[in-house]
From Swiss-Prot:
Disruption phenotype: No visible phenotype in normal conditions. Absence of pseudo-allergic reactions in response to small-molecule therapeutic drugs: secretagogue-induced histamine release, inflammation and airway contraction are abolished. This is Mas-related G-protein coupled receptor member B2. Disulfide bonds: none annotated. Keywords: Cell membrane, G-protein coupled receptor, Glycoprotein, Membrane, Receptor, Transducer, Transmembrane, Transmembrane helix. Belongs to the G-protein coupled receptor 1 family. Mas subfamily. The chain crosses the membrane at residues 41-61, 90-110, 112-132, 158-178, 192-212, 232-252, 269-289. One of its GO terms (cellular component) is plasma membrane. SUPFAM superfamilies: Family A G protein-coupled receptor-like (SSF81321). It comes from Mus musculus (Mouse).
Length: 338
């Protein structure tokens, strides 16, 4: 993500009313644009606040209250990335709101611009890895269950966090977001690297998700649909609808900016709002999937709903297994490797 992209779109100075020359005549911002920006900022603040609360609940249960497995480790790290992204956007939108509504011009610390880059790249990478793992478990089930290293999930997440942080810091330093050390050549270089990273993971996410869906619904040996597959499918779908536009916008920003003569009237805030919705929706998906066809007469705690959303056992098998019903954290399918 380029330094220009963040500074021009997120600094409070970018929202000052300006007059721009367009085809030889003067063009001034309309009240419609200002009203739209105010609405988008308020909605982004509200969604970010709600999303932080929901992701905090997921972090609490998965990090402390629940037994973790290969898949829940990824969900835990995805919730961390979403929480971090929403926190940074909440602070940035709040500072912009102070200027828009109260004309209080607060300079946003440049270091804060690095956090959305880091969090977005981490979330994208982790979600792509989730899709890849489930695809591998379908294509090579025996290898996945018997030969997969035990701590693959934790190690993979650690590597993705480190790589995303390193890329965010290097780009932030080169583009003047850290230490006020702008270098045009290295800024453009890291912009290209970041864009390549994003495009590769976009492609991997789409390809592995499509392969997974084809094997589930169209394969010669259809795979039983479990809550886990529903959770993954909905999470990927929500990202493609709400999260992907943010990545596409930053990749194409170098070209898009040439057509936006009036910065205040572009669509950045709408895209920012959609990205906040994406990070907010994941916990909602978990709880909704966990509550589907919940026929037992028992209290539906959030912990139980979250456990059921991660269930990798078909419903008919679960209903016939009383022991599994009493301990939903152990519902992950276990097969012999002999």
């Amino acid at each position: 993500m380029s330094g220009d992209f963040l500074i021009k779109n997120l600094s409070t100075s970018a929202w000052k009313t300006n007059i721009t020359v367009l085809n030889g005549s003067y063009y001034i911002d309309t009240s419609v644009c200002v009203t739209r920006n105010q609405a988008m900022i308020l909605l982004s603040i509200i969604i970010s606040l709600v999303g932080m609360g929901l992701n905090a609940i997921v972090l609490w249960f998965l990090g402390i209250r629940m037994h973790t497995n290969a898949f829940t480790v990824y969900i835990l790290n995805l919730a961390m990335a979403d929480f971090l992204y929403l926190c940074s956007q909440f602070v940035i939108c709040l500072l912009i709101a102070f200027y828009i509504f109260y004309s209080i011009d607060i300079n946003i610390p440049l270091v804060l611009y690095v956090v959305p880059i880091f969090a977005y790249l981490s979330g994208l990478s982790i979600l792509s890895t989730i899709s890849i793992e489930r695809c591998l478990s379908v294509i090579w089930p025996i290898w996945y269950r018997c030969k997969r290293p035990r701590h693959t999930s934790a190690i993979t997440c650690f590597v993705l966090w480190v790589m995303s942080l390193l890329l965010g810091l290097l780009e932030g330093k080169a583009c003047g977001l850290l230490f006020n050390s702008f270098d045009s050549y290295w800024c453009e270089t890291f912009d290209v690297i970041t864009n390549i990273w994003s495009v590769v993971f976009f492609g991997v996410l789409c390809g592995s998700s499509l392969t997974l869906l084809v094997r589930i619904f169209c394969g010669s040996q259809r795979i039983p649909m479990t809550r886990l597959y529903v959770t993954i499918t909905l999470t990927v779908l929500v990202f493609l609808i709400f999260g992907l536009p943010f990545g596409i916008y930053w990749i194409l920003y170098q070209w898009i900016s040439n057509f936006y003569y009036v910065e205040i009237c572009n669509f950045y805030l709408e895209i920012l709002f959609l990205s906040c919705v994406n990070s907010c929706m994941n916990p909602i998906i978990y709880f909704l999937v966990g509550s589907i066809r919940h026929r037992r007469f028992r209290r539906k705690t959030l912990k139980l709903l979250l456990q059921r959303a991660m269930q990798d056992t078909p419903e008919e098998e679960q209903s016939g297994n009383k022991s599994s019903s009493e301990h939903p954290e152990e519902l992950e399918t276990v097969q012999s490797c002999s």
